[in-house]
Curated annotation (Swiss-Prot):
Protein name stated in the entry: Anhydro-N-acetylmuramic acid kinase
GO molecular function: ATP binding; kinase activity; phosphotransferase activity, alcohol group as acceptor
Listed InterPro entries: Anhydro_N_Ac-Mur_kinase (IPR005338), ATPase_NBD (IPR043129)
Name of the coding gene: anmK
Pathway in which the depicted protein is active: Amino-sugar metabolism; 1,6-anhydro-N-acetylmuramate degradation; Cell wall biogenesis; peptidoglycan recycling
GO biological process, one term: 1,6-anhydro-N-acetyl-beta-muramic acid catabolic process
SUPFAM superfamilies in UniProt: Actin-like ATPase domain
Keywords: ATP-binding, Carbohydrate metabolism, Kinase, Nucleotide-binding, Transferase
Residues reported in the UniProt entry to bind ATP: 12-19
Entry keyword Repeat: no
Organism of origin: Shewanella loihica (strain ATCC BAA-1088 / PV-4)
Transmembrane regions listed in the UniProt entry: none
Function: Catalyzes the specific phosphorylation of 1,6-anhydro-N-acetylmuramic acid (anhMurNAc) with the simultaneous cleavage of the 1,6-anhydro ring, generating MurNAc-6-P. Is required for the utilization of anhMurNAc either imported from the medium or derived from its own cell wall murein, and thus plays a role in cell wall recycling.
Pfam families: AnmK
Length: 369
């Protein structure tokens, strides 16, 4: 039987590189064939970080970065094809998430903006590109996020098993798979790695806290933790989504301004607990017991997993590796899956999750020829 090859491209709020995955959807199965990560050059990273905050000359900077990120995504495709040995003519489509630079769905005319020009990707690779996945959902009154719960349902749902799929990137999102006829629930629950990455970068110049070791060396300040958990976002009911617009360096500086006496590692520990407590609180609102499977960069933070397990004694805490899927690649596979759904004319959103008025085919087609 012929292979149904699709490529998924993802760069999340952590901005730590472009994940490229090659997936085969033949025989009604989801098979991860090969993977590649294209590093984000430091000049591009600093430009994107600047663009994520309001500033002067934004339109020019966005236009240039849109093309630059498109070229980087095309390089990721070329790297993946070279590594896999699969001919580009066998690829049915590329699903490109792009790089989010604004996500503001709750304005009167809500919007979300991902850059990484799909025309550039299509022109440089010669492969059809499906992109701009979020804005149709927003046009239908939804949040445009999270989009992965529909994929989590397809891949991980099992009758009789209550499962939580927890994706911890810069922002963390939860998918609750009840294991019966009840509707799937999913939402962004708050900061994942974004604040702990921001703080260690500011203090130590490191990109991330490996294994959560620095946080583990500190002591959480309960007063600061309580103050941060009082943020109105945490008490919002779903559907809800968030991003760097809320949880960023400016917010972190504002929150810690009265806590200058704390050791830097104590702040790191408190920020990690903010991630863990906000996740645990949301999980317990949904169910007292479940199987919890973690994916995304947070799945590799052993201190995070340890603290999460302690806060959720009724939960079995694992990574998606226990289900046979490497936690690093779950989101990339999801965007290959969304491209496949688009090609087949099938919906990609879950209105119960995003708040959209109906199911819809997501994304636009940018032909490679």
């Amino acid at each position: 039987m012929s292979k149904h090859y699709y490529i998924g491209l993802m760069s999340g709020t952590s901005m730590d590189g472009v994940d490229a995955v090659l997936v085969d959807f033949s025989d009604d199965k989801i098979t991860l064939v090969d993977t590649h990560t294209e590093p984000l050059p430091s000049h591009l990273l600093s430009g994107l970080q600047r663009l994520c905050q309001s500033g002067s000359d934004e339109i020019n900077r966005m236009g240039i970065l849109d093309r630059s990120v498109g070229k980087l995504f095309a390089q990721a495709v070329e790297g993946l094809l070279t590594k896999s040995g699969v001919d580009r003519h066998q690829i049915m489509a590329i699903g490109s998430h792009g790089q989010t630079v604004r996500h503001m769905p709750n304005l009167e005319l809500g919007f979300t903006l991902q850059i990484g020009d799909p025309n550039t990707i299509a022109a440089l690779t010669g492969i059809d590109v499906i992109a701009d996945f979020r804005r149709k959902d927003i046009a239908l009154g939804g949040q445009g996020a999270p989009l992965v719960p529909a994929f989590h349902q397809q891949l991980f749902a099992r009758t009789g098993h209550q499962r939580m799929i927890l994706n911890i990137g810069g922002i963390s999102n939860i998918t609750y798979l009840p294991g019966d006829a009840s509707a799937v629930i999913g939402f962004d629950n708050g900061p994942g790695n974004t604040l702990i990455d921001t703080w260690i970068k500011q203090v130590q110049g490191e990109a991330y806290d490996k294994d959560g070791a620095w946080a583990a060396s500190g002591k959480t300040d309960e007063q600061l933790l309580k103050q941060m958990l009082s943020h109105s976002y945490f008490s919002l009911s779903a559907p809800k989504s968030t991003g760097r617009e809320l949880f960023n360096q400016a917010w972190l500086e504002q929150q810690t301004s009265d806590f200058g006496y704390l050791h830097e590692s104590d702040i790191q520990s408190t920020l990690l607990d903010l991630t863990c407590h906000s996740i645990a609180n949301d999980c317990l609102k949904l169910t007292e017991k479940a199987e919890l499977y973690v994916c995304g960069g947070g799945a590799f933070n052993t201190e995070l997993l340890t603290r999460l397990a302690a806060l959720l004694p009724g939960y079995q805490v694992h990574t998606t590796a226990s289900l046979g899927v490497d936690p690093q690649w779950v989101e990339g596979i999801a965007f290959a899956w969304l491209a496949m759904r688009h090609k087949l004319g099938l919906p990609g959103n879950l209105p119960a999750v995003t708040g959209a008025s109906r199911e819809t085919v997501l994304g636009g087609l940018f032909p490679g020829n």
